[in-house]
From Swiss-Prot:
Originating gene: yubD
Organism: Escherichia coli (strain K12)
Domain of life: Bacteria
GO terms classed as biological process: methylation
Protein name: Putative methylase YubD
Family per similarity comment: Belongs to the N(4)/N(6)-methyltransferase family.
Keyword Methyltransferase found: yes
């Protein structure tokens, strides 16, 4: 039942039943008016009017005793924290992703990304907890101006969910979370507002699906017959 949907995530999530997804992994707009070197921008990045409604819906559709991991803008952490807590989430962990490059330089060069681990209820502890400092491989931002690397997202999905779980990303961009879920043997629901990134995500997911099917076919081809 994996789906990659174009639309306003608040309106789309409002059509979902409550307690519908097993895990949320998302990278919402940071509320900083981002613009990259090519002039690409992020929808909703200049206003926080969507923030509380989106958090309320994420809490509602997430199953009880489950987790959400959300990236955030460090200089807008007060707004994100207030919205998460007002929605009902509790903070249970924090992740730092270390970069090997500087993405922007002001008073200091920015060489990390951060995400909070948020809980609805009392989720079970993972069997193999991840360290709270993880690596970050440059994605190239080919599909989206703030594209997150699949290699950083996939360990989170594999640690915090079981196979066939439903992973939701309401701010899916070009689908990195969905790709990570697909490669992990999980189902996904991605929601992206802008048509250009939704289209890029669809193409990307289709390519990954074809590659996985081809790999499975090759495995079958070389599989020895049972005695």
């Amino acid at each position: 039942m994996s789906r990659f949907i174009q639309g306003d995530c608040v309106r789309v999530m409002a059509t979902f039943p409550g307690n519908a997804v097993d895990f949320i992994l998302t990278d919402p707009p940071y509320l900083v008016g981002f613009r990259d070197r090519q002039g690409r921008t992020i929808a909703g990045d200049k206003t926080d009017e969507w923030l509380q409604p989106a958090c309320n819906e994420m809490y509602r559709v997430l199953k009880k005793d489950a987790l959400m991991v959300s990236f955030y803008g460090w200089n807008r952490v007060d707004r994100f924290m207030a919205a998460w807590k007002n929605a009902g989430f509790s903070v249970v962990g924090h992740l730092v992703f270390t970069k090997t490059y500087t993405s922007k330089a002001a008073y200091v060069g920015y060489r990390h990304e951060c995400a909070y681990i948020l809980a609805k209820g009392r989720p079970a502890l993972p069997q193999k907890p991840l360290p709270d400092v993880l690596g970050w491989k440059y994605s190239g931002n080919r599909h989206h101006p703030t594209e997150k690397p699949v290699t950083s997202l996939q360990p989170l999905i594999e640690s915090f969910t079981h196979p066939n779980a439903i992973v939701l990303d309401p701010f899916a961009g070009s689908g990195s979370t969905c790709v990570a879920a697909l490669q992990s043997g999980r189902r996904y629901i991605g929601i992206e507002l802008l048509e250009q990134y939704h289209r890029a995500g669809q193409q990307r997911l289709a390519a990954v699906q074809r590659a996985m099917q081809q790999g499975a076919a090759n495995d079958d081809w070389f599989m020895p017959e049972a005695a």
